[in-house]
Amino acid sequence: MPSRFTRRSFLTSSAVGTAGLLAPAWLGRMAAHAAEAGLLDRLGVALYTVRDQMKADTAGTLKAIADLGYRYIESGLEPSLGPAVKAAGLKQASVYAPTYLVTGNRAAWAGAGDLLPESYDWSKAVSEAKARGLEYLVVVYLQKAERGGIDVYKDLAARLAKAGEACKKAGLGLAYHAHAFEYEAIGGVRPIDVLLNETPKDLLGLELDTFWASIAGMDPVKMVETHAGRVPLVHLKDKAKGTPVQYDEGKVPHEAFTEIGHGEVDYAKFLPAAAKAGVKYYYVEQDYCTGSPLDSLRTSRQALANLTTGKRA
């Protein structure tokens, strides 16, 4: 791994020392470049990528992730992985909170895994996250029973704003993770626009997933630029070349998911744009891998290292 005195720290200190000599546009570019160069220090893995490996050997899988050079992991709020994560030398900044704590629709999640006790409410999730030193809670997915027309998303926006207010009071942030269906227009209006336009920016951020935005026909670069300052978290994964637009995640073929640098997402443009937009944490995720998920994670991290440092790291 690079030493602490990296190109990022050099550029940052240089920007301060020469602020009076450079035009503001140059300062902005240098700051973004410095942030991009530090991406590897804030790079993690979304554990859905290694879900089977985690079930078989939690400690071993987390150690393998750390050995690949990743620094963070993102997982569900419960059960807590804190001790195992710390033992592996990894960190957590964000976790997925149960969606039904916001929507109120527990029935939609029946059969999707163990549900938390009915006494466990959003305030409990916020308290747990705060106690663990986390920074963000993420609403990661809506079951089909939780979706609907635009009025449903307007109601969800109000619920998210309320949840975000509780997070803000606790010193946390709330982010919404969009898949593809949120980008499909309903009567000319996209649900993602409703969720973001009808919630205050300081109460709800976006966890942008480059794959799902791309497969929905969106440009991830334009998305992160449009919502600059509101995208603290991103999921990085690539979309196989020639994959058509698809809004239904259940109909996306497994082979559409591929390692970073092997698909259509333009990461050479996305990473600088994300840095400039203020993205704080980056999580590599690959829903399906043709081989070992750990091999896929190795390939994707190397691609990111090549893009951000221009050399192997």
What residue spans do the PLM features occupy?
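N-terminal secretory signal peptides and thylakoid transit peptides that target proteins
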Residues: M1-L21
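Conserved, mostly hydrophobic/aromatic
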Residues: V45, I65, I73, V85, ...
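Acidic/histidine-rich catalytic cores of soluble enzymes
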Residues: K168-E264
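Short, acidic/polar
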Residues: Q53-A64, L115-E128, A216-M223, Y267
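Acidic (Asp/Glu)-rich catalytic clusters
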Residues: A35-L40, K63-D67, P79-V95, S123-L134, ...
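C-terminal segment of N-terminal export signals and the immediately downstream linker at the start
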Residues: W26-D57, K63-D67
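Active-site acidic/histidine proton-transfer and metal-coordination neighborhood
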Residues: A15-V16, A23, V102, R106-G205, ...
